[in-house]
């Protein structure tokens, strides 16, 4: 039996990842706002991955509360993520994925391009996402990750500006 994956946040994106982990054979434990993170870490001290998939506005409050037992197992996905977002909390090398697919409520996933991933559990993210037909491209270095995160940020700013014009 495979080690579990803990999901902090189980919205639209979290639900997609949870489905991928389940399809790949990993038990998934969701952690919602009502669940104490320290208690969850005591109950599941050594998960394969702790994937934080919360809304942009909630990311920092979750990272502030993350139990030290999970520091080496953290995975992050966020639209406007940059290294400063995790470095300030002491996470040296989290697993990070820059998501290049859309998921709207009541609609199927729409893949734009393969999502780049880097970090200790990037292969796990690739395995899970590809099990549900979402391509993931593994990166070889932190500098490649930084480049991909900046590209994603530029894309978001550009689409937001374009939306203001129309």
Please state what every model-predicted region is.
Residues 1-43, 124-131:
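NAD(P)+-binding Rossmann beta1-loop-alpha1 motif at the extreme N-terminus of oxidoreductases
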Residues 3, 26, 48, 72-73, ...:
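A structural micro-motif
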Residues 7, 52-53, 144, 148:
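Active-site-adjacent beta-strand anchor residues
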Residues 14-22, 34-110:
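Rossmann-like NAD(P)(H) cofactor-binding subdomain of soluble oxidoreductases
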Residues 45, 150-153:
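A short, glycine/Asx- and small/polar-enriched loop/turn
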Residues 76-151, 158:
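Rossmann-fold dinucleotide-binding core
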Residues 161-166:
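N-terminal glycine-rich phosphate-binding loop for ADP-containing cofactors
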């Amino acid at each position: 039996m495979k080690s579990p994956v803990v999901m902090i946040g189980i919205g639209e994106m979290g639900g997609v990842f949870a489905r991928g982990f389940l399809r790949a054979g990993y038990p998934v434990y969701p952690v919602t706002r009502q669940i104490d993170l320290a208690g969850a870490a005591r109950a599941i001290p050594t998960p394969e991955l702790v994937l934080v998939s919360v809304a942009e506005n909630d990311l920092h409050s979750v990272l502030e509360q993350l139990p030290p037992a999970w520091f080496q197992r953290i995975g992050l996905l966020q639209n406007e993520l940059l290294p400063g977002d995790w470095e300030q909390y002491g996470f040296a090398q989290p697993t990070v994925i820059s998501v290049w697919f859309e998921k709207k409520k009541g609609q199927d996933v729409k893949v734009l391009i393969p999502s780049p991933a880097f970090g200790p559990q990037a292969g796990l993210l690739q395995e899970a996402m590809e099990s549900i037909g979402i391509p993931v491209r593994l990166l070889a270095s932190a500098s490649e990750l930084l480049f991909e995160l900046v590209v994603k940020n530029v894309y978001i700013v550009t689409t937001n500006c374009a939306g203001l014009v129309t």
